[in-house]
Amino acid sequence: MAIEPPGTPHENTGKQLVLQKIYVKDISFESPRTPDIFSKNIAPQTQLNIKSSSKEIAPDLHEVILTLTVEAKDKDQTLFLVELQQAGVFLIRGYKTEECRALVGSYCPGSLYPFAREAVATVVSKGGFPQLLLQPINFDTLYAQALKQQASDDDSVDGQSLAGTFGEPH
């Protein structure tokens, strides 16, 4: 059996998933305490918030945006704040609605995350701080948790109920 590259239509199914474009939609770096903090011995605490959203931009074309907010603090003082929207355009064809939602909610953000990690590490280093290595994330688990949370919050799903949370259309 030959291994098909991603995006190759599966025999008899017509299913296709192709990453067409990856880009930074928005990025911001703030370091309000520089250069004073460079001369201090600090032990920063870093917090990562992550969110995914999507929209259909044409039939079978989905823009997926992975938003990361990384804040490093020492006690109550912000050392740096990074806000990043890493985006991609995905062709998703031949999948059932639920399958498409799962792809957009977990597979697509997972494909974007390595690029987002690199962008965050680069901007933090260029800001004069030690490289920040964000740990891998299981996006299947995050998506499942978001669905579970939605089900417990509201039993009536209108298709937009997860707007603003992980992996759903906005």
Kindly give the residue locations of the regions a language model identified.
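N-terminal intrinsically disordered, cationic/polar leader segments
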Residues: 2-111, 115-170
